[in-house]
Design a protein with these regions (language model features):
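Chalcogenol-based redox active-site neighborhoods
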Residues: 1-154
């Protein structure tokens, strides 16, 4: 593992209230970053994690999605897609910058700065696995499989 990222001691607004990542009590955490609510790839990813939430819960693992969208946009996305996971609003890009997920992207022929789809697994507040340049389809299943393997190894 070449990345050494700590969870920041900062409170963020979420669809279910607020969360301070440094104060989470779950043994395991999946923190995934996605570009924008209600877009095809992001919907695929969020629905994938939501469908597997019970399996992650059984492994004492919390799932949190992060984007720059507002809490209201997250709530609309959650309601429309019947999501069961909590989403963090990072409008000020505090988490995005902390995890270095803001990258230059080509969108409709223009260079823009946006979130590079990325996921991080933490065990007892320590980063144990990271995924960069994630493909949305099948990603939640891969993370669940990797989490099970990490738990066997720990």
């Amino acid at each position: 593992m070449s990345e050494n990222i700590q969870l920041p001691n900062h409170t963020f607004p979420t669809t279910q209230g607020e969360v301070n990542l440094a104060e989470l009590t779950n043994e395991w955490l999946v923190l995934y970053f996605y570009p924008k609510d209600s877009t095809p790839g992001c919907t695929t990813q969020a629905v994938g994690f939501s469908c597997l939430k019970d399996q992650f819960d059984a492994l004492n693992c919390q799932i949190l999605g992060v984007s720059r969208d507002s809490v209201k946009a997250h709530q609309n996305f959650t309601e429309k897609q019947s999501l069961t996971i909590d989403l963090i609003s990072d409008k000020e890009e505090i988490l995005c910058k902390h995890f270095d997920v803001i990258k230059e992207k080509n969108m409709y022929g223009k260079q823009v700065m946006g979130i590079e789809r990325s996921t991080f697994i933490f065990h007892n507040q320590q980063l144990v696995k990271s995924y960069r340049k994630v493909k949305a389809a099948g990603h939640a299943e891969q993370v669940l499989q990797d989490l099970k393997a990490l738990q066997v190894a720990s």
